[in-house]
C-alpha cells in the first residue's frame, strides 16, 4: 500500500511562484511551464522508457520562504520587498504546509527533498515517494491544489 499522511502530521512548509486561477485564487495546474502546479518532463523530472518518473531527487521546485525563490520567479509587484524581482505579475507566491523545511511527506505519495550540501538550504523539490507513472505524479501534485494559499507578506 502507498504511504499516506497520518492524522496530525505537519507537512513541511514550502513556497512556489505559480500562475493564479482568477476563478478560485488557486494555482493553475499544468506541466508545460515552471509557473504551474506540476513538473515538466525532461526539465524538472526524468521519465524512463516505461513512462515512469525516475527517483533521482528531481521534482517540482519549491523554497522554504517565498523570498528564497529565484528573483526571476518573484512577481515584479513585490520589488519593494525583494529588490530586483523580475517575475511576471500574473504569478503569485503560494505556500503549502506548516512544518520545518526538512525531508518529509508533503501529501499522499509526495515528499519534500531539500537540496543537500548547503549550510542554508533555499531550495528543494516535491518528488514522488515511489516509482509512479508520470500521469500519477501529475495527479498527485494536482491533488494538493486546494491546499495552496497565497502568501506574499
Whereabouts are the PLM-identified features?
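NAD-dependent ADP-ribosyltransferases
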Residues: 1-153
